[in-house]
C-alpha cells in the first residue's frame, strides 16, 4: 500500500499541500515533516480568516488529525517543535473563532487533555524553579552571613502566621483608635490621593483625600525595604504583609506609593476628560490574532501613566457577550453598593479572616512568592495592554525568510513567533524558563521541552471560549493527562547530581482514568505572580464555572471543585457576598475554596 504523500508530477509537486487559496484534507496525513509544516503554516492562516474552512475541519476529521499531532508530544528537534506549535495554533484558531458547534467539536475531539497537560507542566516548572531558587538563596545567605544564618533560618522556617494568641494581639493593635486628624491644605486636594483603607478594593477608582493615616500606610515602608535591603529584610516584609487580610494579593508598590499621599494619576482623576487615553486602556481586541495598530511614540510621562493596567472587571471583550466568556452579568465597576436580591447570602466578613491557623498556612504556602525569582509581567512593558499573537501568512513572504534562518532558537521557541512584526508586542520568555536557561548545568535538550508562555496563554483563552457551554462541563471535570506530553522526566533531570534516567514504559492513554479536573489547574493561574494576561483568561474560565445550566432548569453547581454538588432547585445555594457570582452549598465549601477564590473574587456593584 502506497504512502499518503500523494505526489502530483504534472504540477511538479512532491506531495499534496495546503495553500492560502486551496485546502486539501490529504495534506494533513503527510508523513514528511517539511511539507506538513508548510501545510500547517497555511492552514493557520485559513483557520484565522475563513469560517468555511473551520466548518470543513469539523466534518472531515481534520480536528482529530491535529489533536493526534499534538498528542505525539513535543520533540527536541526544531522541525518537530515547529510542527507541534503550528498544529496547536490551528486548533486554537478553530476554537476561538468558531461557532458553538465548531467549539463543541473541538472539545469532543479530545483537546481538553492536551490543554490540561500543558497547564500542569507549566505549574510543575514554576514549582521547580521556585524550589531551586529558595534553596540557592538559603545557601547564599548561609555562606555570606554565617553568624546570622540561624536568625535567617528562623525567619524563613517559621510559619507565615503566628499562633492564634499573637494573631489576636496583632488584629487588636490594628483596630485601635486612629491618631488625630491631619490638616491637609486646600491646594493638595487636587494633587494628592491617599490609599484606600478597604482591604478588598483592588480597582483603580477615584478616591477622596483622607483625614487620618490609613491602616496600611506601612506598606510604603515595607515596599521601600523590599527593594533596598537584603534578603533578611525581604523575608520579614513578606511575613508582615501576610498579616494583612488579603494584602498578599496586592503588589506592595501599587498599594501605596511613598509613605502616605501620592499624586493622582490622570486615568484615575479625569477619565471623562481624557477619552483617548481611557479608551486605549479599556480596549480589547477581537481575538489574540487581531494585529495592533501602528505604534505611536509617547513621552515618558505618558508611558508611565498608561502602564496602569485596568482590572479584570474593567476589561471587556469586543467579540460580544456570547464570546467573551465572562458569564452573565459581568461587572464593569467596583462600586461599594450592591443591589438587594432575594437569594440567601453566605455571610463572610469583608476581610474574610478565616480563623483556622492551618488554613492560613495553606493559603500563604499556595501563593508565596519566591525571593530569588523576579517575575516580570510582559504586558506591562509593552505598548499594547492585551494578549495579542499575530498570525502571519506566507503571502507577504516574510515568515519563511525570517523563520527558516532562525536555527539557533533558544529555549525551544518555535520559529512561528513573529518577532520581527512591529505591530505585535514581543512575548517575553517566562522568568522561570530564563532561570533555568541561565544555569549552565541544565541541558539544552531539557529546555526545549519546557512549556512556553504563549502556549499557556492560548490554552487559557481556548478554555475561556469553550468552557461556557454547560453541556460540555463533564469534559473539563473528568479529563486526564497525555503521557507523551508530560515533562516529569525532564524535571527529574534538573535535580542536582541526578543520573541519566532511563525512559519509563509509556502508558497507554486510553487506559488512563479520567480523574483530572481542569478547573483547579486553571485557578492556580489567577494568583498574582503570573502575568496579567494569564490572570485575565484564567478568571474568565473560573467565572464560566459559575454559569447556570439552562438545560437543567437554571440550576448551578457548587463552586468548590471537590464538592461539585448541584442544586435541586433554583437559588438553593448561597452566593458569595463579595462577587455574588460563585455559589456554595455550605460554609465549609466556601471556606475551603477561598484559598484561591480570593484571587478572582471581585466586588459586584
From Swiss-Prot:
Main location: cytoplasm
Keyword Zinc listed: yes
Biased composition (Polar residues): 189-206, 279-306
Localization of this protein: Cytoplasm
Renumbered residue ranges of the record's region Disordered: 133-241, 274-349
InterPro entries the record matches: ARM-type_fold (IPR016024), MYND-type_zinc_finger (IPR051664), Znf_MYND (IPR002893)
Entry similarity comment: Belongs to the MUB1/samB family.
Protein name: MYND-type zinc finger protein samB
Amino acid at each position: 500500500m502506497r504512502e499518503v504523500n500523494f505526489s502530483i508530477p504534472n504540477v511538479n509537486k512532491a506531495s499534496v499541500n495546503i495553500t492560502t487559496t486551496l485546502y486539501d484534507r490529504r495534506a494533513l496525513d503527510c508523513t514528511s515533516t517539511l511539507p506538513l509544516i508548510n501545510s500547517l503554516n497555511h492552514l493557520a492562516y485559513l483557520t484565522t480568516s475563513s469560517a468555511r474552512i473551520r466548518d470543513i475541519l469539523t466534518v472531515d476529521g481534520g480536528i482529530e488529525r491535529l489533536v493526534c499531532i499534538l498528542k505525539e508530544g513535543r520533540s527536541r528537534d526544531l522541525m518537530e517543535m515547529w510542527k507541534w506549535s503550528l498544529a496547536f495554533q490551528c486548533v486554537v484558531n478553530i476554537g476561538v473563532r468558531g461557532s458553538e458547534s465548531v467549539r463543541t467539536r473541538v472539545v469532543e475531539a479530545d483537546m481538553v487533555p492536551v490543554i490540561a497537560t500543558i497547564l500542569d507542566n507549566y505549574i510543575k516548572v514554576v514549582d521547580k524553579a521556585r524550589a531551586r531558587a529558595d534553596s540557592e538563596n538559603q545557601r547564599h545567605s548561609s555562606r555570606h552571613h554565617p553568624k546570622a544564618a540561624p536568625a535567617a533560618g528562623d525567619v524563613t522556617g517559621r510559619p507565615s502566621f503566628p499562633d492564634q494568641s499573637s494573631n489576636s494581639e496583632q488584629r487588636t493593635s490594628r483596630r485601635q483608635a486612629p491618631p488625630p486628624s491631619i490638616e491637609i491644605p486646600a491646594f493638595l486636594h487636587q494633587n494628592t490621593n491617599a490609599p484606600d483603607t478597604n482591604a478588598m478594593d483592588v480597582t483603580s477608582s477615584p478616591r477622596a483625600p483622607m483625614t487620618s493615616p490609613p491602616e496600611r500606610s506601612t506598606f510604603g515602608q515595607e515596599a521601600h525595604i523590599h527593594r533596598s535591603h537584603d534578603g533578611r529584610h525581604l523575608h520579614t516584609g513578606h511575613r508582615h504583609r501576610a498579616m494583612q487580610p488579603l494584602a498578599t494579593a496586592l503588589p506592595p508598590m501599587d498599594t501605596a506609593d511613598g509613605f502616605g499621599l501620592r499624586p493622582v494619576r490622570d486615568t484615575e482623576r479625569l477619565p471623562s476628560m481624557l477619552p483617548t487615553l481611557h479608551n486605549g486602556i479599556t480596549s480589547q481586541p477581537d481575538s489574540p490574532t487581531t494585529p495592533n495598530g501602528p505604534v505611536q511614540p509617547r513621552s515618558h510621562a505618558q508611558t508611565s501613566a498608561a502602564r496602569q493596567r485596568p482590572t479584570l472587571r474593567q476589561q471587556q471583550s469586543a467579540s460580544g457577550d456570547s464570546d467573551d466568556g465572562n458569564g452573565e452579568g459581568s461587572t464593569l465597576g467596583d462600586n461599594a453598593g450592591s443591589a438587594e436580591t432575594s437569594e440567601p447570602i453566605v455571610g463572610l466578613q469583608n476581610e474574610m479572616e478565616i480563623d483556622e491557623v492551618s488554613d492560613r498556612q495553606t493559603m500563604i504556602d499556595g501563593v508565596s512568592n519566591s525571593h530569588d525569582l523576579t517575575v516580570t509581567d510582559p504586558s506591562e512593558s509593552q505598548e499594547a495592554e492585551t494578549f495579542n499573537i499575530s498570525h502571519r501568512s506566507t503571502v507577504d513572504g516574510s515568515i519563511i525568510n525570517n523563520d527558516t534562518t532562525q536555527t539557533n532558537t533558544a529555549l525551544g521557541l518555535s520559529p512561528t513567533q513573529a518577532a520581527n512584526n512591529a505591530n505585535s508586542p514581543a512575548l517575553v520568555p517566562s522568568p522561570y524558563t530564563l532561570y533555568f536557561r541561565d544555569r549552565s548545568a541544565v541541558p539544552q535538550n531539557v529546555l526545549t521541552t519546557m512549556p512556553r508562555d504563549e502556549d499557556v496563554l492560548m490554552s487559557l483563552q481556548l478554555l475561556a471560549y469553550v468552557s461556557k457551554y454547560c453541556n460540555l462541563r463533564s469534559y473539563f471535570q473528568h479529563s486526564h493527562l497525555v503521557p507523551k506530553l508530560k515533562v516529569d522526566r525532564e524535571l527529574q533531570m534538573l535535580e542536582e547530581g541526578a543520573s541519566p534516567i532511563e525512559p519509563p514504559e509509556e502508558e497507554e492513554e486510553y487506559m488512563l482514568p479520567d480523574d483530572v479536573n481542569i478547573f483547579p489547574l486553571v485557578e492556580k493561574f489567577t494568583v498574582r505572580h503570573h502575568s496579567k494576561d494569564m490572570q485575565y483568561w484564567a478568571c474568565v474560565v473560573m467565572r464560566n464555572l459559575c454559569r447556570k445550566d439552562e438545560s437543567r432548569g437554571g440550576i448551578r453547581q457548587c463552586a468548590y471543585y471537590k464538592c461539585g454538588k448541584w442544586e435541586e432547585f433554583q437559588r438553593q445555594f448561597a452566593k458569595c457576598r463579595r462577587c455574588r457570582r460563585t455559589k456554595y452549598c455550605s460554609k465549609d465549601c466556601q471556606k475551603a475554596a477561598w484559598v484561591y477564590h480570593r484571587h478572582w473574587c471581585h466586588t459586584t456593584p
